[in-house]
Amino acid sequence: MVSIKQGSIIKISLDPKQGHEQKGYRPYICLSHSVVTKYSNIAIFAPISNTKRDYPFYVPLKGTKTTGKVLLDQLVTIDFNARDYRYVEDVTEGLLDNLLARVKVLFEKG
């Protein structure tokens, strides 16, 4: 199995979910530093959706087979080895840098 690292896209089901949370077997991108994924089975992921909504924290995927937008305001911590997942692909360095820069804004004091 391919090692999950920062920038990896996987498909995984996080059901059961509630309310407006993303449901079903769907793509997620790993945002945790690769040191975290190397020594732990737990990492922070953002869901990927084909939403049409424009929002500063919904970042379109470019340069990938996976389509949609990364929903940076819906981060989840996943124990990915406790669930059935499938590695899909890695994003480009440029896209990963863009995602990480936007995620930092979510945690700034405001």
Task: Give the label of every model feature segment.
Residues M1-G110:
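Conserved functional hotspots at enzyme active or ligand-binding sites that engage polyanionic ligands
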